[in-house]
Swiss-Prot record:
Gene field: fabF
Free-text function comment from the UniProt entry: Involved in the type II fatty acid elongation cycle. Catalyzes the elongation of a wide range of acyl-ACP by the addition of two carbons from malonyl-ACP to an acyl acceptor. Can efficiently catalyze the conversion of palmitoleoyl-ACP (cis-hexadec-9-enoyl-ACP) to cis-vaccenoyl-ACP (cis-octadec-11-enoyl-ACP), an essential step in the thermal regulation of fatty acid composition.
Pfam family, one: ketoacyl-synt
Active-site residues, Swiss-Prot/TrEMBL: C165, H304, H341
Protein name from the UniProt record: 3-oxoacyl-[acyl-carrier-protein] synthase 2
Keywords of this entry: Acyltransferase, Fatty acid biosynthesis, Fatty acid metabolism, Lipid biosynthesis, Lipid metabolism, Transferase
Domain Ketosynthase family 3 (KS3): 4-411
C-alpha cells in the first residue's frame, strides 16, 4: 500500500455521446440513454459499419475561436472543452503563483486521424507544398496536453500516454502517481478521442473489431449472446485531481479519492487479450494491492466491456479469477453500452462514472441486456440503474498491444 500523499478528485469535464457536459452525461447514464445512432460525420455507404456514438448538438465555435479551432484536430478541441469544464468545476485558480505546481497529462489513442486524412489528400492531389504547416502539431497525440496547458497556463508536469484503449486510465494513473509522490499539487488529466473518420472506421473494420450490426438497440450489447464487436464513440473525459492538502486548503468540493493504480502488459498478441484475461487480472490485483484492499472491499466495477465476443468473456474470467467468491456480490456494468467505445477517452469518461457512482450511491446500468451470455454470469446491472452504497469502486481499461490499466476509487473520508 502506498504510504504517500492522498489524492482526491475535485473537478470533472466531459463531452460524450450522451451529453456535452458532466451533469447531462451522468443523468443520461443513470437513465440508460442510448447514445449510439447512424454515423453522420462521414458517408458510410462503402463501409460495413454504419453506427457510432457521436456528439450531439455540439458546435466547437461556441467554445473556441474559429481561427484557433481550425489549427486543432477534433481530439484536441474536445480536450480543451472538457478541461475547461473540469477546471471551472474544481474552481482551480491557475496563476503565476500556482502554475508551476499544476500539470497536464491527457492521452489520445490515435491522435489526429482526421488531420492525417486531409493532409494525405492534399499531398496526393496537389503535392508536398500544399501540406499545412500545422499538420504535425495537429496530428501528434501529445498535442491535447500541449494545447490544454497553453490554454489554461498550467506549467507543471506535462506529458501524454498512448496505450490504445487503456490510454485514459493510464493517463489518470500516471497523473495520480505524480501528485502522490509530491511532484505536483494538482493535475488536469484524462483522455480524448475523435475517431469517427474514414480511415479509423476502415481500419478498425479491417481488424474485425467493430460491430456490423445496424440495429442501434443491439449493436453494442456487452456480455450478451450475439455480440459481434464494439461501436466507436468520440469525446473526452477530464479530471482535476490534487493533493488532499491542496484541496482542503482551498475548500474544494471532493468527489472521491483515488487510492490505487495497476498497470500490466499481456506480452501475448497485438489485438487479442491474453487467455483467461491473465494480464487484466494482474492489473486488478496490482491496483488493489496499491490501495491496500481485498476483493471483498470493492462494491462496484466499471468494466471495459466493449461488446466483443472474446474481450467480454476474457474480462469476466479475469474478474472471477481476481475476485474469487467476492465476484458473486460485485456489481459490474459496462457504460459503453450507452456511449460506445471512446478508445483513448473512455478511461476518462468511466473514471467520472466511477467517482460519481461513489458520490451519489448509484450505479449506471448495462443497457441492451436482453440475451445474457451464460458464460458472462456476473451481476451486470441490467438495463436500469441501481442504488448502491459504495466504499470502493474499480475501473478497468484494456487496450490493443496488451495494455491493462485499472484504477481504484474510494469514498472520501477526511
Amino acid at each position: 500500500m502506498s504510504q504517500n500523499i492522498r489524492v482526491v478528485i475535485t473537478g470533472m469535464g466531459a463531452l460524450s455521446p450522451i451529453g456535452n457536459d458532466v451533469k447531462t452525461t451522468w443523468e443520461n447514464a443513470l437513465k440508460g440513454v442510448n447514445g449510439i445512432d447512424k454515423i453522420t460525420r462521414i458517408d458510410t455507404e462503402p463501409y460495413s459499419v454504419h453506427l457510432a456514438g457521436e456528439l450531439k448538438n455540439f458546435n466547437i465555435e461556441d467554445h473556441i475561436d474559429k481561427k484557433e479551432a481550425r489549427r486543432m484536430d477534433r481530439f484536441t478541441q474536445y480536450a480543451i472543452v472538457a478541461a475547461r469544464e473540469a477546471v471551472k468545476d474544481a474552481q482551480l485558480d491557475i496563476n503565476e503563483n500556482t502554475a508551476d505546481r499544476i500539470g497536464v497529462w491527457i492521452g489520445s489513442g490515435i491522435g489526429g486521424m482526421e488531420t492525417f486524412e486531409i493532409a494525405h489528400k492534399q499531398l496526393m492531389d496537389k503535392g508536398p507544398r500544399r501540406v499545412s504547416p500545422f499538420f504535425v502539431p495537429m496530428l501528434i497525440p501529445d498535442m491535447a496536453t500541449g494545447q490544454v496547458s497553453i490554454d489554461l497556463g498550467a506549467k507543471g508536469p506535462n506529458g501524454a500516454t498512448v496505450t490504445a484503449c487503456a490510454t485514459g486510465t493510464n493517463s489518470i494513473g500516471e497523473a495520480f502517481k505524480i501528485v502522490q509522490r509530491g511532484d505536483a499539487d494538482a493535475m488536469i488529466t484524462g483522455g480524448t478521442e475523435a475517431p469517427i473518420t474514414h480511415m479509423a472506421i476502415a481500419g478498425f473494420s479491417a481488424s474485425r473489431a467493430l460491430s456490423t450490426n445496424d440495429d442501434i438497440e443491439t449493436a453494442c450489447r456487452p456480455f450478451q449472446e450475439g455480440r459481434d464487436g464494439f461501436v466507436m464513440g468520440e469525446g473526452a473525459g477530464i479530471l482535476v485531481i490534487e493533493s488532499l492538502e491542496s484541496a482542503q486548503a482551498r475548500g474544494a468540493n471532493i468527489y472521491a479519492e483515488i487510492v490505487g493504480y495497476g498497470t500490466t502488459g499481456d506480452a501475448y498478441h497485438i489485438t487479442a487479450p491474453a487467455p483467461e484475461g491473465e494480464g487484466g487480472s494482474r492489473a486488478m490485483q496490482a491496483a488493489m494491492d496499491d490501495a491496500g484492499i481485498e476483493p471483498k472491499d470493492v462494491q462496484y466495477l466499471n468494466a471495459h466491456g466493449t461488446s466483443t465476443p472474446v474481450g467480454d468473456l476474457n474480462e469476466v474470467k479475469a474478474i472471477k479469477n481476481t475476485f474469487g467468491e467476492a465476484a458473486k456480490h460485485l456489481k459490474v456494468s459496462s457504460t459503453k453500452s450507452m456511449t460506445g467505445h471512446l478508445l483513448g477517452a473512455t478511461g476518462g469518461i468511466e473514471a467520472i462514472f466511477s467517482a460519481l457512482s461513489i458520490k451519489d450511491s448509484k450505479v449506471a446500468p448495462t443497457i441492451h441486456a436482453v440475451t445474457p451470455d451464460p458464460e458472462c454470469d456476473l451481476d451486470i446491472v441490467p438495463n436500469e440503474a441501481q442504488d448502491l452504497d459504495i466504499t470502493y469502486a474499480m475501473s478497468n481499461s484494456l487496450g490493443f498491444g496488451g495494455h491493462n490499466a485499472v484504477l481504484v476509487f474510494k469514498k472520501f473520508e477526511a
